[in-house]
């Protein structure tokens, strides 16, 4: 698994430090923050920074200080982000997304769904895009 991840990171220009100091990590706080970042448009940059903190910098992505540092570097008000992430509404929204993923049969990342079709794995992205572009009868 790690060698495969190393090849993918090399191909995509992503830093990776192996072996990981912590694996697996608790990504719940990061997931809650990513969800509230969607309306503001900072979720992609946040996600990439969390990936780097986890896999390149060997930081604890469940630690509030790590996440606050990432948010601050993105120009996001970390106090406001944490407050919004921890509301019952946001927690429920993440639970709903997780339940939907389970109901659709998602079991790993990355997974893609086009309608009811499930594509799993980074190497299946092109197939998912092709499927999405193909007219269905």
What are these regions (language model features)?
Residues 49-137:
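C-terminal cap of thioredoxin/glutaredoxin-like
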